[in-house]
Swiss-Prot record:
Main location: secreted
Record-linked Pfam families: Cys_knot
Role description: Promotes spermatogenesis and ovulation by stimulating the testes and ovaries to synthesize steroids. The LH alpha 3/LH beta 3 heterodimer was shown to have potent renotropic and weak gonadotropic activity.
Signal peptide: 1-20
Protein name, entry field: Lutropin subunit beta
GO CC entries: cytoplasm; extracellular space
Family, as annotated: Belongs to the glycoprotein hormones subunit beta family.
Keyword tags: Disulfide bond, Glycoprotein, Hormone, Secreted, Signal
InterPro entries xref list: Cystine-knot_cytokine, Glyco_hormone_CN, Gonadotropin_bsu, Gonadotropin_bsu_CS
Record note on quaternary structure: Heterodimer of a common alpha chain and a unique beta chain which confers biological specificity to thyrotropin, lutropin, follitropin and gonadotropin. The beta chain can also be formed by LH beta 1, LH beta 2 and LH beta 3.
SMART domains from the UniProt entry: GHB
Subcellular location: Secreted
Disulfide bridge map: 29-77, 43-92, 46-130, 54-108, 58-110, 113-120
Length: 141
């Protein structure tokens, strides 16, 4: 009887572990709110703003025999639908365009990394690092 109880406990914990690993521990690819920074060399300020970006988990695979078969392309969380918004940097000298444009995620999907439109690297240690003093946060959603 104890062996049966142990087996049942092992099964329940195993199923719970699988269920938990697919839940909130790995959020799927989706738009999330993020604070970004914008500045230009000629303008004296840095503006932080909140917008929606694509982030989250995409299923990836690696071949067991990479020597025989070519590598599998890894999919990343990237924009499916987007629009562009702009912020105006105050205090820019005449002749310097004060506008900075950025994408706003409307929907996301897992797809190939296109370096022309996607930052395929990992998380940044200092995503809001600016050379100029920051102004208060602006919200763009």
């Amino acid at each position: 009887m104890e062996m049966l109880q142990g087996l049942l406990l092992w099964l329940l914990l195993g199923v719970a572990g699988v269920w938990a690993s697919r839940g909130p521990l790995r959020p799927l690819c989706q738009p999330i709110n993020a604070t970004l920074a914008a500045e230009k060399e000629a303008c004296p300020v840095c503006i932080t703003f909140t917008t929606s970006i694509c982030a989250g988990y995409c299923l990836s695979m690696k071949r067991v025999l990479p020597v025989i078969l070519p590598p599998m392309p890894q999919r990343v969380c990237t924009y499916h639908e987007l629009r562009f918004a702009s912020v105006r940097l105050p205090g820019c000298p005449p002749g310097v365009d004060p506008m900075v444009s950025f994408p706003v995620a409307l929907s996301c999907h897992c797809g190939p990394c296109r370096l022309s439109s996607t930052d395929c690297g990992g998380p940044r240690t200092q995503p809001l690092a600016c050379d100029h003093p920051p102004l208060p946060d602006i919200l763009f959603l």
